[in-house]
Regions:
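The DNA-recognition helices of helix-turn-helix-type DNA-binding domains
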Residues: 33, 44, 69-73
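Short alpha-helical DNA-recognition segment
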Residues: 20-38
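Short amphipathic helical patch at the helix-1/turn junction of helix-turn-helix
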Residues: 16-18, 42-45
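Key DNA-contacting residues within the recognition helix of helix-turn-helix
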Residues: 38-39, 66
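Short C-terminal boundary/hinge segments that cap the last helix of small helical domains
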Residues: 59-75
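A short, Lys/Arg-rich alpha-helix, primarily the initiator
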Residues: 1-25
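Short, basic-rich loop-to-helix N-cap that marks the start of a DNA-contacting helix
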Residues: 43-56
Length: 75
């Protein structure tokens, strides 16, 4: 089963913008370069440990998006 409706990179980028944070800040806090940030924003899926780090950094549980989709598929 593939979850096609969720593009986690776009959700992360949208949240970063809504918090008024820059890509430079995001890169610095994650210890990565800006190019890697744009790769994250463009990616429809993401490594679990990286998503945990991003969730803690932005104080948003991005896993809830997956849980909602999974629950709808299970119902």
């Amino acid at each position: 089963m593939i979850i096609t409706k969720l593009h986690i990179g776009h959700l992360i980028q949208d949240e970063l913008r809504s918090q008024g944070r820059s890509v430079a800040w995001f890169a610095r806090e994650l210890g990565i370069d800006r190019t890697s940030c744009y790769r994250i924003f463009g990616a429809p899926s993401i490594d679990t440990l990286l998503l945990i780090r991003i969730s803690l950094l932005l104080k948003v549980n991005f896993f809830t998006f997956y849980i909602d989709i999974l629950q709808n598929k299970l119902d």
